[in-house]
Amino acid sequence: MKRSAINEILGHTRQFFSQHDVHLPPFASFPPTQWRKLDAAAWSEVFDLKLGWDVTAFGGNNFAAQGLTLFTLRNGSPKGMPYEKCYAEKIMHVRDAQVTPMHFHWRKREDIINRGGGNLIVEL
């Protein structure tokens, strides 16, 4: 995916989050110049647990049909070390008619809360 497409997707998602009163931490809007100035040690949990934005087409090339935009607020680390959390908190944006593939985690819990008002279809 081209950077321009990713930027457009993120802009649309930010607007959607704003409309639904979803507030993200300040680092959600850091430009690259600000990231480069950070003390990596002070921000190690953000880097280690890959907190922040994800835009994915799940290996395909049709984001509109099969894709997902999400912001990871909290995340557990493998086997609980060094960050002892068994859950993840992710704010996801799935567009109309967009599908996300099934997946599961052996050692992580996730709550799914539909705040956008769309139809959420879950297959168990």
Predicted regions and their residues:
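Short glycine/proline-enriched turns and hinge-like loops at secondary-structure junctions
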Residues: 84-86, 105-106, 114
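Conserved hydrophobic/aromatic beta-strand scaffold that supports enzyme active sites
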Residues: 70, 91-93, 111
